Amino acid sequence: MNDKALRTEALSVGLEPPSFKDLLIPIPNSGTKKKNKKKKKPKAKKNVETQANVDLLGSAGTDSAVTDVGANNGVIDHQASLELSNLNSRISHPQLVSANGDDSSLINVEGISSTDWQFTLESDDTIEHSPQCILSTSSFVDEAEFPVHIPGLEDATSSNMSPNSVQNNMNLNTVALGSSTSSKRKKKKKKKSKANSASLNVDDQRDFEQVYSTDVAITYRNGQALSYYNGSVRQASMNNNVNNNKSKDIWSSSNTEEREQIREFWLSLSESERRSLVKVEKEAVLQKMKEQQKYSCSCSVCGRKRLAIEEELEVLYDAYYEELEQYANIQRNLANTESVNASDEGSDKSQKGIISDSPKLLSIPLNNVPSKSLNDDITQDELNSSNADVDEEVIETTSLEEKNVDNQEFVTSISNGNQTLEDTSHSPQTQPPFQPPYPSKADEKNSYHSDLYNFGSSLTVKGGILTVADDLLKNDGKKFIEMMEQLAERRMQREDNSNFHEPELYESGLEYDEDEEEDEEDVDEDELDLMTDEQRMEEGRRMFQIFAARLFEQRVLQAYREKVAQQRQAKLLEEIEEENKRKQERELKKIREKEKKRDKKKQLKLAKEEERQRREAERLAEQAAQKALEAKRQEEARKKREEQRLKREQEKKQQELERQKREEKQKQKEREKKLKKQQQEADREKMAREQRLREEEEKRILEERKRREKLDKEEEERRRRELLEKESEEKERRLREAKIAAFFAPNQTKEGSDGCTTSSQLGLFEKKGDLVNDEDKLSSHLLDSVPNALRQAPIGLKNTNNLSERNASSNLLNSSLFSSFNSVNPLISLEPNPLNRTLNNSVNLTDFGRKPNGLHSPSSLLSNSNNFGLNPNARHSLSRANSPVHHYPFATPPSQRANKYPLNNGANVPALLNSFSSPQLSPLVNRVLNEPSSSPLSSSSLKSPLSKEGVLNQQGHEQYNFSLSPSIRNKLSPICRPSQGSSPKLKNNLSNTEERMGSRALLDDKTDSVITASNSTTSGLSRDESSNPNNYELLNAFNQNTWKISRSTSNKSLIPESPWGVALGAFTPNASTQSIPWGNRTWTD
């Protein structure tokens, strides 16, 4: 059946195999008309040459991947160190996770190179690790070369050529891919250079192949493999027996043992691990292939050629992947139907059915059946190397496919793989070699081609991922490993054939002449022209098969190397640990030995010490016995001596007691004598002291008596003198009052008041004669009119007048004479002080009109500016209680206090005894008014404004002082402090008032002195001596409290000797309390 029939059958099944006809660049048919002379002989020679070159190429490509590991142990150790470093880097970077989500990672391949295109997958940070990119960085750089059968490029496999020369050769020979052909002369030179390079490097290629085979034997020998699973390194261990038997061969192994170790390693892997090793992704491989071209020539010609090659390769990859993917779909459908049928028959039959179905799946006809020309050029070495290459790149890509499409089939194949392990390993009939449906005659003659075809037929694509058929991975993967071994055996045969034909090549090359070369060129051109599209498609498939085989092999080798490195690392750690343990054991042994020696020495020392102690104890016992005997003898002697001593002491004590008794008696007698003498002396001193005291007492009494007498005399003289002074003052005051009363008498009669002055009194003032005689008469007349009871009453009760006198005094201020006073000085106020109201309510003699001492602040002068603050109808306007600067409070009205305290004779005392009314003006006032020039009220003096000031007269009472001019007085009298003998209650009130009103600040302690009774004849405040009292007659006339009380020497004076007591009418709190008889009652002061 030809290709057309195969396409028809594929279309009937539902497949549409792609054709490469439109994808490849057409080759010029310039040589089609030439004759095919000498075709067979040159062609046979050419086949032999190309076969040898391809064999050397495959061996060189795969050998370059393992040049780091030699046959000797030194090379193996070096490779082990590289593997350990790679393992540590991968463990520290667990980000390489497959894209299908099953957390299975892969073992990366970094170097896949070809002699024609230099495919080297190396570490490159420019490649992004996309979910579909499975190729990543690794420390292993394995170069797997892929020689595609393109005439004219076989001799580019020389390892001594530089990358630029290889690239130039590749670019010059792109005729097979559709580029324009060169002249025959250029082809001759090119082929000669290739043949020479191939012949010169045969020995080098052998050496590479020798190293590769040795390295494969070493690598395939050791026990375990590493696969990345769930983001961590998973160690797939073999059987314990295998590990125990082969652990001694880890550090050294032979070529014969490595194959067995590789086989055991592959069989020890699970199905999922084997599946992960045979997966590769198309895009990553193409990307690496393109990146490799960056290191070639960068000229425009080479760049165009390189782009053409890359595009052609991509077209070939795409077409082949599409065919394989369609074939994989057919396999999957058949496998699903067979698995359903097998499940009905039971577990045992299902296992056999799966095994028997494997050849059926592989026997499906494909359009990618390799042709004879393709099979002739495939070598065993290339397939072995491609095995390892494919293994690494297929891991994650298949996992993507399985996740989306064939997840169930993947799980079923894993579960069934272990069950069919033993059956397939012991039944070769279940693994018949796969033959193409229509093999050619060359394939029937050569079993190697059938093996390669079986491998190519086993490749499949799932979701753009190249992998191997499932039956090669099941049954412990024996099919796959057996196929790899068969390909390796074919490689060995090819090596023998190449060695056998090598002399012929050199001979044939020497015998050729130019004509033969030209004929050969013509034949080659004819062969190129005769290549059909099917051959080009088969060439592309062949390239993919070689690539997959080498990649799979490289994957397995690298996994095995990592497992060996892991084992070596573990073994090294174990040896180190064992060495440490041995060291510790040796040290412990030494320590134990030292301890034993020390114990023995201690025991010897203890024995010697015990012996010494025993001897010492015996010696001490003997000494103790001797000491006891000696002590006994000494004790007896001591007792004897003690008895004798006691006897002597007893005698001495007796004698001492007798002596003490005699001395005590003598001392007693002496003490008695001394006491008697002391008693006599004390009596004499006592009598003398008493006598002296009596004399001193008598003397003191005499002196006290004399002092008292002197004081009494002085007191009597003082009282007498004061009485005389007071009488004279009283006379003067009465005279002034009489003058004032005479002065205001006319106004008083006009207003209809009850005046007390008689016509005889008024007549006395009409004359302008001697004022003194008139005043004396008037004062004597006024004194006669005072009742005797009032004269004997206290001072506070003497100041009583008729209401007519009060009205007269009030009318005096309201008269036209003082109208100027009222208008000029609005500051004068006669309001009572609140303190006086408080004192007026006390339950003592203030009810009789007694006023406490003390001054009040003149701050009340600021109010009641009109008419001195008086109501014209007020009856007590000029009384002492209404004075703004007076210290007396308002008196109680007469209606409330009349007949309150009766006198001794039964007469009622007026209630307002202490409210002093203004008397009638004396003739002195008239004289002053009639004589303006001599009176202080002259016209010249009236020009200045009047001011009302509270001043004190000679008796210390307040009076009204109408100051007409500042020149009238040189200095105001200072306000003195109260006496120290004032009562506490009034003293506190007055002191608070003084502090508030500022009376303390008005006294200058340095310049002003308080006039007392002892140093001044006048009581009250001090005044300037230069001022004439006569100038103040009119002002003194306003002083109303002029009643005095006569004192008797027999009775203690009620008036205190302090200046305030005299000034305030003797009613001060410091006055001694006396009981004064007053009618039927007693007045207590």
Curated annotation (Swiss-Prot):
It is found in: Cytoplasm. Keywords: Coiled coil, Cytoplasm, Phosphoprotein, Stress response. Residues 510-526 have a biased composition (Acidic residues). InterPro entries: Fungal_stress_NST1, NST1. Disulfide bonds: none annotated. Transmembrane segments: none annotated. It comes from the Eukaryota. Residues 430-439 have a biased composition (Pro residues). Residues 561-744 form a coiled coil. GO terms for cellular component: cytoplasm; cytosol; P-body. Residues 932-948 have a biased composition (Low complexity). Residues 22-52, 176-200, 418-446, 492-526, 577-731, 877-900, 927-950, 971-996 are annotated as: Disordered. One of its GO terms (biological process) is negative regulation of cytoplasmic translation. The modification Phosphoserine is found at S883. May act as a negative regulator of salt tolerance. Belongs to the NST1 family. PANTHER family: LD36051P, STRESS RESPONSE PROTEIN NST1-RELATED. This is Stress response protein nst1. It comes from Schizosaccharomyces pombe (strain 972 / ATCC 24843). The lineage of its organism: Eukaryota, Fungi, Dikarya, Ascomycota, Taphrinomycotina. The gene is nst1.
